[in-house]
């Protein structure tokens, strides 16, 4: 679903649960993996071309990955930043077993999400709380924030990289996808409506 041209005539392709790196001769030279890589979507390079944003829709998350080492430099889970509980059944999701147990003691329905149980697809579509499906470094703010589309919520959000806090830039969309810079702003599709929107940079 994702493709990015890398330095030295290499390129990256996001598969379901991993990112494959190829050289100019189409030889696979590296594979980047993480437990919470699931149902991957877009991959976008940073301005310095040393890192990339990886959208893991299957686990309601976005990662920044070092291209050479595969190390995670930054991460964001919707579950930690207001996108909980799940609409389907009211269950609170977490990657922290102790947090799940605490919620359960409080009488809440909670699910400890262990990637070993769900694999490279992650949670099923209806089992996700947000389902981010595209993200981009905010080039208008020196990449200090990330803009992203949320499938379930129909939102365009801006994420503060320091805190993970979210500002909703646009809501009420019907399955938004593919936020990209356009001119001095942003272009995004509202897929089910068959239309697109342009947004100001701030």
Where are these regions (language model features)?
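Short loop/turn positions that demarcate and connect the beta-strands within blades
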Residues: 35-38, 127-129, 172-174
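Structural signal for beta-propeller blades
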Residues: 19-21, 60-63, 154-157, 194-197
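Short loop/turn segments that connect beta-strands within beta-propeller blades
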Residues: 23-27, 66-70, 160-164, 200-201
């Amino acid at each position: 679903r994702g493709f990015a041209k890398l330095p030295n005539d290499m390129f990256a392709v996001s598969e379901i649960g991993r990112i494959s790196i190829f050289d100019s001769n189409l030889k696979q030279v590296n594979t980047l993996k993480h437990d919470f890589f699931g149902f991957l979507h877009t991959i976008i390079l940073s301005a310095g071309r040393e890192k990339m944003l990886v959208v893991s829709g299957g686990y309601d998350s976005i990662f920044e990955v070092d291209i050479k080492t595969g190390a995670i430099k930054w991460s964001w889970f919707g579950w930690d930043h207001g996108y909980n509980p799940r609409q389907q059944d009211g269950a609170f999701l977490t990657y922290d077993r102790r947090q799940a147990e605490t919620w359960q003691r409080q009488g809440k329905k909670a699910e400890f999400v262990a990637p070993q149980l769900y694999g490279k697809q992650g949670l099923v579509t209806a089992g996700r709380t947000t389902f981010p499906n595209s993200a981009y470094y905010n080039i208008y703010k020196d990449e200090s924030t990330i803009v992203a589309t949320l499938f379930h919520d129909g939102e365009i959000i801006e994420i503060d990289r320091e805190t993970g806090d979210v500002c909703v830039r646009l809501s009420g969309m019907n399955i938004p996808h593919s936020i990209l810079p356009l001119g001095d702003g942003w272009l995004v599709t509202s897929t089910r409506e068959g239309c697109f929107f342009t947004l100001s940079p701030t």
